[in-house]
Each structure stands twice: as C-alpha cells, then as structure tokens.
C-alpha cells in the first residue's frame, strides 16, 4: 500500500492539494488521503521533511530496518562541524556514515545495499550530471565553480501572500 503524509494538508486528498497528479498517468494517487502520521507496515519511506526534522523522524525508521530516501541535507553533509554551522546540532549523526549519496548515475552499486539514501539537491544533480563525466575522465581540473540559479520559490522557500506572491529574494541578477 502507498500512503502519503503531510503536515499542513493532513486530511485532504492528494489530488486536491496537487491537481496535476490527477491529470497524469498516476491518477490513482489523486485519491490517496494525506495523513498526519505514517501508518501501518512500511516497505520504504521517502522523506521530504525540512532539514533537521527529517533526521529526527527517520532515525527510528532506520533503527527498525525501514529503507529511507531523504531529500533534506541531513545525510548529505558528512562533516558534523559543517552541518552544525548551517543547521545546528545533527539529530541522528550515527546514521551519517551509512548514508549513500543518491546520484544513481555515479553510485548505483552502493545504492543497492544501503538503508539510507541521501538524495542530492537539484543544483547538485544538475552540476554533477553535467560535469561528472569530465571529472571521471580526468578532463577538467578538480576544483570548479558552478554558478547556479533558482527561482525565488526554490530551496524550500514559502510564498508570502502579503508580498504579492514573492518569496524573499535578496537582489536581482
């Protein structure tokens, strides 16, 4: 069985929150009700919680043997001092060593045997897929600068209705 949880939309149907789901080949998912908590036996979990909240939630799932794909930065950053600088104390540092960076094009074999996939962010995926083959063939220097842009609603920013729908852009390009 498939279940979908949500904080702010618990009790609503997936198709009501995400109308595009009903218009795709995944129509059956539109009728799933969003729940506030995970229910029943779990084969795997994809966590889309914010940084820190994800590690707090998935630590017990991992301890119970449930495979997890985590989309936050919680298991991507292997150095605890760096993580602490950006997010504060890590809620589940004991799981960091077993996490595999989830870019299947480069880490396919490692991903087959891990219980926790540290899913890369969109900018990292774009950069690594573009320049990864050149790195692997030793065609470029090992240190590069990637200048990547996102829309103002990217990086988990929430739209503020009181500002006309914009998020919090610092400056323009």
Each language-model region and where it sits:
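N-terminal Rossmann-like NAD(P) cofactor-binding subdomain of oxidoreductases
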Residues: 1-172
